[in-house]
């Protein structure tokens, strides 16, 4: 087979006698049929087969409805073996099925559904996966077997339901209309009374019959004739498929007798066909060519086409990043030619095959209501979110501190909502506490922080029971902690014996396979920095060795490879380590799937430094296709790409600047608090986790600016491709490139395609924030190492901005507070704004830069909001225009600096929450001059002659009669009134300048967002 498949099952003739059956543990003889269940490897980013004898496969509990669709390799079997497997699929593995008796009733063996069952609850521990209520001991319960995507090695696992709940979800669970209670495995062990009850609850559903009056003469006869014609056609096709299969296998059998493997390779090469690996694959390709003709190269990429079940698939690559997606049932061919030297072989002398086209079985798809194969999709929805009345299903809640309700009341509320109470931090999905407890950060709260569990207020419990908002929205609204990743949800059922699994974990890899939904920054890698790079702690040598540096080049590489089609999201890390004291050298490498602990590592001690360098360079070239010292890297198909990750020596500087700040600072307390807020490393990490950035493969501040700019360029290409309606393979190629450059943590999920404007816009926003975080972190790492100075003062100096606290009783403070109060838009009613502090700011060199525009008419004091993590970049470098590499999508009027005259319009860009309600917002003087007024989106790359800015006209505007002028600058602080402009797509005004020199930042406000509690 040419490429790995997404199919869950596989069948083939055993290539050797080495494989053992996972069921009976006996060896599987060579050339006998073996069937496999494909599972995610714990050792690398890919799937491996768990092989079974044909008879053992069905005993495990696997259920297949359409072997020709669900099983990889099915069509390559001999015809009789295909029929055997079809029969076993219908009967749950039995082949001794008798036909109907003379009366045609009752003598046919009924199929027992292996993936559906009935029985009595053995305890009170099981929970119905529909209503989430307990199933009492001794009560009848029904099951649907599923495969959990995060634990595929466990195989088929029972998910239990009350009979009534099962009936309600019948179609969703794939219990087909023709099935009834009698088909359930275990039905016969129920009492006669329970059997009768269940038969009434779960009967076979017959098709709706016509009313007598609806029958029209002749219709039934036509239907009968039509069905007979169709049946004859099916029989004819079946005979043709059998004849074709027999012919192919006859050719293969004769070739095996007449030719060696090398002979078969020569035949392929002579006919300009690629030679695959594996004897059986070579034989398949030669037989295909001899029967149907030699395949011509793919028209799109010139790759090799290969037969795979339902069509011929291209195995080539459209680019170095992406495989070709061509699939056809009618490939172009030429005549198969047998070389002269082969014509002396007796088989080839008498060989006469009439050239023909390959016949394919009709495209069969699983009927509506049929049981879907037990893949990731089969896992019940409750794993991720509970039913509306049980929103905390499968979640464990930890409570800390004094709450308004006592512990029993809180426990009752949580259990009513489907959750469970826990006293252990590392088992918790969520923590409910108070702001006071979070600020106090006692030992228990430290454990919560270490486990990276979100902390929410008690109000969360009240809102979730009545609110129509999603769980994630409510979590954000009530969040109290600055830390916390995605909420963990425990699997819905105890899916196997504790501490055991179907696959033994490698001694080299650390920990079990990560569960989907596990929090994304839970595992923190401590990097020991020596010399030019961080020593990987998994090597066990972080305290004894360092990464070799020679000729200015650090012998450490982090590589990435993403293939959305295959679902892989892989990394490979390579390091050459040198002992700190002795002349000893090691090569350390680790590999796996990004964002999970799937993977392994290897440490090899080398005889000498020269051997170590040679081995390192050999491995690097093997993985990337490029020489280590090559100046211009060229990406090769199916090869890794290097990530420019800067493991500089500045990590200790960051630690120094974040330990005990404020003890020696002489700055005013509000300014000290502002600096701490701007340089808060935890907030930066939280922002990266929100964007699904992998903090292990791309630690904070480590991705280079150049690589971020390259990612912008890819997004620009995506936008262009979408607007031009480019091919799917082009979009796929760009998506693969983007995710390789910027490592994302998708767990076990496939990386999503960047195939719409919204996904591009979201990634642009992510890169904007990454750039600012990169600036903030660079500032933290660089500059003065004067230990006599307070860390806050050191960071303050790096901003190169004079920051003064504005007296709350001053006139300018009064004007600003009035501006905040009056311009809060009526539609932005989820919160009120409270001014905490006002700072007057003067960026170094900005007033000089602004001087030419000081004389321009129409200067206004306007709002600009942004995330707290962006302010180190804003204050140190000013408000900037998106880089040239960035796509124009997401910018309503092109790339520029955007302002608003309504405070809440800008405040929405602060991205605060109830748990993190403090935001920062700017007031900047913008030299607008002559404004180009627009009502709808338009990409502006160059302003019309005589225009200095753009104004997006909104339906609401501050009352112009209430505006005031301060030092020649208009302050539009009137309350919102109708602008009289109705045919506009904007609710509120927007102002855009396209030259950074037209902006002079004046004030920075610290605002508290007082979120209003939901009333519904």
Swiss-Prot record:
The modification Phosphoserine is found at residues 41, 180, 188, 277, 280, 784, 788. Residues 376-526 are annotated as: Automodification domain. The active site is at residue 990. It is found in: Chromosome; Nucleus; Nucleus, Nucleolus; Cytoplasm, Cytosol. The modification Phosphothreonine is found at residue 596. CDD domains: BRCT_PARP1 (cd17747), parp_like (cd01437), WGR_PARP1_like (cd08001). Zn(2+) 3 binds at residues 298, 301, 314, 324. PANTHER family: DNA LIGASE (PTHR10459), POLY [ADP-RIBOSE] POLYMERASE 1 (PTHR10459:SF112). This is Poly [ADP-ribose] polymerase 1. The gene is PARP1.
């Amino acid at each position: 087979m040419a490429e790995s498949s997404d199919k869950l099952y596989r069948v083939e003739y055993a290539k050797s006698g080495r494989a053992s059956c996972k069921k009976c543990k006996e060896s599987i003889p060579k050339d006998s049929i073996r069937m496999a269940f494909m599972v995610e490897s714990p050792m690398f980013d890919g799937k491996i087969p768990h092989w079974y004898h044909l008879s053992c496969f069905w005993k495990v509990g696997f259920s297949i409805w359409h072997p020709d669709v669900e099983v990889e390799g099915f069509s390559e079997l001999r015809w009789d073996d295909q029929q055997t497997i079809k029969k076993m699929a219908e009967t749950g593995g039995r082949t001794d099925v008798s036909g109907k008796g003379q009366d045609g009733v009752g003598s046919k063996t009924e199929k027992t559904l292996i993936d559906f069952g009935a029985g009595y609850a053995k305890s009170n521990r099981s929970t119905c996966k529909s209503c989430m209520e307990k199933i009492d001991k001794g009560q009848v319960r029904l099951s649907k077997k599923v495969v959990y995507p995060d634990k595929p090695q466990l195989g088929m696992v029972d998910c239990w339901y009350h009979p009534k709940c099962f009936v309600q979800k019948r179609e969703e669970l794939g219990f087909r209309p023709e099935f009834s209670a009698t088909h359930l495995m275990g039905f016969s062990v129920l009492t006669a009374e329970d059997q009768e009850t269940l038969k009434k609850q779960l009967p076979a559903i017959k098709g709706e019959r016509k009313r007598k009056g609806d029958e029209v003469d002749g219709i039934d006869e036509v239907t009968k004739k039509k069905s007979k014609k169709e049946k004859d056609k099916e029989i004819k096709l079946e005979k043709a498929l059998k004849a074709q299969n027999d012919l192919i296998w006859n050719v293969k059998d004769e070739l095996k007798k007449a030719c060696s493997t090398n002979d078969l390779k020569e035949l392929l090469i002579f006919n300009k066909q690629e030679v695959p690996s594996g004897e059986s694959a070579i034989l398949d390709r030669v037989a295909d060519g001899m029967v149907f003709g030699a395949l011509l190269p793919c028209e799109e990429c010139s790759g090799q086409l290969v037969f795979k079940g339902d069509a011929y698939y291209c195995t080539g690559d459209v680019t170095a990043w992406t495989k070709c997606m061509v699939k056809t049932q009618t490939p172009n061919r030429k005549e198969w030619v047998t070389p002269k030297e082969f014509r002396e072989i007796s088989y080839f002398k008498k060989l006469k095959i009439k050239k023909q086209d390959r016949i394919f079985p009709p495209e069969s798809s699983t009927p509506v209501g049929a049981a879907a194969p037990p893949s990731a999709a089969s896992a019940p929805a409750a794993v991720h979110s509970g039913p509306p009345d049980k929103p905390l299903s499968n979640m464990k809640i930890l409570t800390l501190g004094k709450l308004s309700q006592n512990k029993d009341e809180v426990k009752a509320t949580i259990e009513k909502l489907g959750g469970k109470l826990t006293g252990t931090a590392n088992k918790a999905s969520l923590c409910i506490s108070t702001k006071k407890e979070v600020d106090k950060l006692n030992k228990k709260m430290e454990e919560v922080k270490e486990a990276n569990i979100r902390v929410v207020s008690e109000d969360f419990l009240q809102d979730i029971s009545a609110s129509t908002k999603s769980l994630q929205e409510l979590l954000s609204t009530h969040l109290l902690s600055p830390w916390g990743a995605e909420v963990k949800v425990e699997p819905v059922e105890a899916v196997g014996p504790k501490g055991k699994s179907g696959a033994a974990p490698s001694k080299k890899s650390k920990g079990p396979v990560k569960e989907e939904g596990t929090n994304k920054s839970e595992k923190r890698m401590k990097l020991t920095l020596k010399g030019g790079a961080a020593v990987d702690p998994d090597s066990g040598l972080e305290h004894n060795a360092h990464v070799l540096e020679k000729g200015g080049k650090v012998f450490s590489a982090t590589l990435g490879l993403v293939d959305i089609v295959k679902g892989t999201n892989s990394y490979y890390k390579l390091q050459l380590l040198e002992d700190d004291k002795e002349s000893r050298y090691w090569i350390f490498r680790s590999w796996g799937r990004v964002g999970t602990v799937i993977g392994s590592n290897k440490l090899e001690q080398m005889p000498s430094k020269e051997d170590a360098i040679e081995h390192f360079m050999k491995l690097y070239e093997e993985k990337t296709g490029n020489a280590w010292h090559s100046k211009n890297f060229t990406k090769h198909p199916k090869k890794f790409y290097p990530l420019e990750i800067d493991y500089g020596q500045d990590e200790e500087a960051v630690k120094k600047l974040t330990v005990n700040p404020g003890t020696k600072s002489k700055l005013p307390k509000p300014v000290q608090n502002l600096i701490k807020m701007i340089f808060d490393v935890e907030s930066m990490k939280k922002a990266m986790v929100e964007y699904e950035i992998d903090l292990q493969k791309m630690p904070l501040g480590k991705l280079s600016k150049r690589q971020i700019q390259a990612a912008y360029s890819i997004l620009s290409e995506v936008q262009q491709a979408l607007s031009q309606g480019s091919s799917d393979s082009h979009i796929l190629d760009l998506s693969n490139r983007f995710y390789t450059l910027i490592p994302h943590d998708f767990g076990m999920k496939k990386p999503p395609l960047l195939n719409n404007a919204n996904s591009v816009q979201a990634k642009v926003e992510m890169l904007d924030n990454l750039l600012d975080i990169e600036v903030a972190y660079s500032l933290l790492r660089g500059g003065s190492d004067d230990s006599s100075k307070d860390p806050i003062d050191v960071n303050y100096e790096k901003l190169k901005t004079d920051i003064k606290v504005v007296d709350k009783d001053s006139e300018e403070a009064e004007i600003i507070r009035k501006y905040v109060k009056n311009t809060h838009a009526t539609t932005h009613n989820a919160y009120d704004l409270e001014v905490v502090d006002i700072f007057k700011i003067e960026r170094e060199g900005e007033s000089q830069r602004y001087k030419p525009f000081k004389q321009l008419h129409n200067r206004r004091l306007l709002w600009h909001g942004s995330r707290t993590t962006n302010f180190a970049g804003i204050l140190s470098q000013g408000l900037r225009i998106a880089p040239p590499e960035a796509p124009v999508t997401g910018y309503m009027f092109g790339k520029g600096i955007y302002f608003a005259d309504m405070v809440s319009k800008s405040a929405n860009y602060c991205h605060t929450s109830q748990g993190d309600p403090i935001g920062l917002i700017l007031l900047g003087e913008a030299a607008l001059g002559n404004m180009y007024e627009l009502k709808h989106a338009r990409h502006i790359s160059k302003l019309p002659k005589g225009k200095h800015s753009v104004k997006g006209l909104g339906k609401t505007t501050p009352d112009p009669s209430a505006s005031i002028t301060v030092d020649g600058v208009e302050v539009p602080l009137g309350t919102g009134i109708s602008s009289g402009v109705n045919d506009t797509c904007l609710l509120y005004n927007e102002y855009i300048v396209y030259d950074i020199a037209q902006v002079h930042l004046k004030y920075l406000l610290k605002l508290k967002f007082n979120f209003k509690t939901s009333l519904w």
